[in-house]
Amino acid sequence: MTAESMLANGAFIMIGLTLLGLAWGFVIIKLQGSEE
């Protein structure tokens, strides 16, 4: 595994985690809003 591929994989992982975080936060907000 080269350094370039490691950097590329790291970038994809960061993007994936960011999207998951945004989606998870959106779901939590929707659930909290529906409870009230």
From Swiss-Prot:
The cellular location(s) given in this protein's UniProt record come to:
Cellular thylakoid membrane
Residue ranges annotated as transmembrane are 9-29
Q: InterPro entries attached here?
A: PetM_cyt_b6/f_cplx_su7
Q: Would I find RNA-binding among this entry's keywords?
A: no
UniProt keyword list:
Electron transport, Membrane, Photosynthesis, Thylakoid, Transmembrane, Transmembrane helix, Transport
Single GO MF descriptor? electron transfer activity
Question: What Pfam families would the database entry show?
Answer: PetM
Q: Which domain of life is it from?
A: Bacteria
Q: Which GO terms describe its biological process?
A: photosynthesis
Cellular component GO terms, alphabetically? cytochrome b6f complex; plasma membrane-derived thylakoid membrane
What is the membrane topology noted in the UniProt record heading this document? Single-pass membrane protein
Q: Give the UniProt family note.
A: Belongs to the PetM family.
- What does this protein do, in the record's words? Component of the cytochrome b6-f complex, which mediates electron transfer between photosystem II (PSII) and photosystem I (PSI), cyclic electron flow around PSI, and state transitions.
- Summarize the subunit comment: The 4 large subunits of the cytochrome b6-f complex are cytochrome b6, subunit IV (17 kDa polypeptide, PetD), cytochrome f and the Rieske protein, while the 4 small subunits are PetG, PetL, PetM and PetN. The complex functions as a dimer.
For this entry, the protein name equals Cytochrome b6-f complex subunit 7
Q: Which organism is it from?
A: Synechocystis sp. (strain ATCC 27184 / PCC 6803 / Kazusa)
